[in-house]
Amino acid sequence: MIEQVSIYLTSMVLGIMLFFSFVIAPVVFTTLDEDNARKFIRRIFPYYYNVNLGICLIVLLTFIFLSKLGIDFYLILAISLLFAVSNYLLMPLINKYRDESQDKKFKYSHFISVVINFVQMIFLALLLI
């Protein structure tokens, strides 16, 4: 039962990530003007990262409870750490670079965040197969 819950929660994180990446973000930038799109993205991303981080931490706790400390544990640990790094280190830098019109640094740091997001989705898919 608890193991099944961890599978559902892992699936939920992947679903949230896919929905956010392929529905929310594109719709925001094609619907809102640039200023409002920026404001919206800056408000929603912390929730996106923290909700996913919270769910992953619950999965980690279930793995610990089940003494499931193999590759799956380390994958979800890596995913969790990447959510924390993205939210608490990378996002403030991305916002700073955008605000200061440092386009090269903004594009590079944004690219890193996209790569991290993609890696997390791959890790989640590996957990589910």
Briefly describe each language-model feature range.
Residues M1-I129:
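Polytopic transmembrane helical bundles with strong interfacial aromatic enrichment
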